[in-house]
Amino acid sequence: MTREFSLENTRNIGIMAHIDAGKTTATERILYYTGRIHKIGETHEGASQMDWMEQEQERGITITSAATTAQWKGHRVNIIDTPGHVDFTVEVERSLRVLDGAVAVLDAQSGVEPQTETVWRQATTYGVPRIVFVNKMDKIGADFLYSVGTIHDRLQANAHPIQLPIGAEDEFNGIIDLVEECAYMYSNDLGTDIERVEIPEEHKELAEEYRGKLIEAVAELDEEMMMKYLEGEEITVEELKAGIRKATTSVEFFPVICGSAFKNKGVQILLDAVIDYLPSPLDVPAIKGTLPDTEEAIERKSSDEEPFAALAFKIMTDPYVGKLTFFRVYSGVLNSGSYVKNSTKGKRERVGRILQMHANSREEISTVYAGDIAAAVGLKDTTTGDTLCDEKSLVILESMEFPEPVISVAIEPKSKADQDKMGTALSKLSEEDPTFRAHTDQETGQTIIAGMGELHLDIIVDRMRREFKVEANVGAPQVAYRETFRAAAKVEGKFARQSGGRGQFGHVWIEFEPNEEGKGFEFQNKVVGGVVPREYIPAVGAGLEDALKNGVLAGYPLVDIKAALVDGSYHDVDSSEMAFKIAASMALKAAVSKCSPVILEPMMKVEVVIPEEYMGDIMGDVTSRRGRVEGMEARGNAQVVRAMVPLSEMFGYATALRSNTQGRGTFSMTFDHYEEVPKSVSEEIIKKNKGE
């Protein structure tokens, strides 16, 4: 089977936005116009083609990024719909990693919102070119130029309109194209009757002003165009398009367009912009990787001629075909039924079948080429972030890094039957989502699940019930506290048991000191003259690592500590690895009195958006939750409060905010850093954990 679309005519794009900016609706319309859907599904009726998991339809938010393929004007457009809710940022990071370009959807009334900023930052990290689509132009309070202003103010991005709306709210009935100098008028709500006309007289002046600004902005990034512009020469439509494309693909410029996906206005023009301005796999830099043995850096170009290399970016469990592994092909060709090497794990895998996804239906294909996105059935050991490559030409593509979970809950199966199924369900779910962890607490025997926020864990429990038919009771959320040392000290650990028969003897002196934040635990051996034999030194390190897991104050993991073994003694007969392990853990316990241990708690960056009149109440509430207000600003007719609040104080905040603002306030939070807890709180935590 030969290639259906050339690499040049392929676009891999993501659609990213704040929750409720209308991202799923926009994707739906794209699928509708490219002939993939026969009936349009409305998100607020719960029938959207992209939101294919049951809970997504119920909550009206997108959770897993479904990868869909569509066709438009002789191009293949692969779309990854990414979630806009802050608890799912890992999904967004994961999809951005494999995209060549993205469409950032904004709500015309609110402009750039907190989650938009988070997603935008992630896209900048991965160097993803973007187009901005100002959606919901039909909504009350829609303001296109205000939205463009928020892109400059809040994202500091070089964004310029390449279109202007004709009218807004109920009056929104057309779009001015500044590049082609024409207008498109809509006569019906299905958006199928579009008339290309001259720019209406009353809009000409504004259009000229903004076209001038656009040309100036593009010319600043293109010397040749700058010369023409300064000499007063006419810049042709083709030259302007080429200039915008070049500046957009090099992530120096972001074109802004407008429309209303719900009213089917501007969607076809959005598709044209994707093809005109977002990069094909040939326009983005070759992917970098390393050779597994030597770690030497190499590049793989986007070409069918190169050896096969792909990155697995998502695992899903499908009720009909089992485990689906979504992957992006960076180079080469892959046929179904062939073998590949998972170079990250060093395992050989057989690709049973290759599927191309259309939101919730799928078609089986026999071959995928460079630049394609597809799903494989039959991979056993592959997880998110693994590289799949040709067995004869190994490479490891840079993998992705995921944040540690910040919140955990205990979960108990309701019956014996549920208990057996729960293990399977949890292992499948943690395979799909690297920020979700499940483990058994050694002391209590409880199963603990951990994730990125309350909504994240709610949805996991919900999926267990729906997909795996496991009923479970969920405990109160627990915060992932940590402990660390604030002072340095030299302490002794001595373990001696010599009562008849072979004894046990281990003796160490260890210097503990605080390490830099985020550096973790570092162990050094500074013993001179063999006072502790070489073979026992790893046991000292291992003994400390084991003991660190259960902390010294309240049983939370100890982090960011340096330990150096400086002295000790041993016994020819009675010393053993076990004895030195125990001696090391005794030294750690002895450090409590000397190293000033403290408890650390996760601090969340919280943004609350509220009407002005509730400002006082909300500020008071934030302070009562041990929060620090870090800034305020007016956003449209609302006030935004930015604060740093401990996670432990944020449980149930959604309910409190609703009642404080009669349901008119919204908030979002993301994990920011760990901070020392105040003494009074620390005492409470210690008491509670010791069961006093």
From Swiss-Prot:
GO biological process: ribosome disassembly
Presence of keyword Repressor: no
Classification via CDD domains: EF-G (cd01886), EFG_III (cd16262), EFG_mtEFG1_IV (cd01434), EFG_mtEFG_C (cd03713), EFG_mtEFG_II (cd04088)
Binding locations of GTP: 17-24, 81-85, 135-138
Gene Ontology CC terms, in alphabetical order: cytoplasm
Subcellular location: Cytoplasm
Keyword Protein biosynthesis (UniProt): yes
Keywords on record: Cytoplasm, Elongation factor, GTP-binding, Nucleotide-binding, Protein biosynthesis
SMART domains reported in the protein's UniProt record: EFG_C, EFG_IV
Domain tr-type G, residue spans: 8-282
Gene Ontology molecular function terms on file: GTP binding; GTPase activity; translation elongation factor activity
Disulfide bonds: none
Task of the protein: Catalyzes the GTP-dependent ribosomal translocation step during translation elongation. During this step, the ribosome changes from the pre-translocational (PRE) to the post-translocational (POST) state as the newly formed A-site-bound peptidyl-tRNA and P-site-bound deacylated tRNA move to the P and E sites, respectively. Catalyzes the coordinated movement of the two tRNA molecules, the mRNA and conformational changes in the ribosome.
Record-stated family: Belongs to the TRAFAC class translation factor GTPase superfamily. Classic translation factor GTPase family. EF-G/EF-2 subfamily.
Name recorded for this polypeptide: Elongation factor G
Source organism (scientific name): Bacillus mycoides (strain KBAB4) (Bacillus weihenstephanensis)
Gene name in the database record: fusA
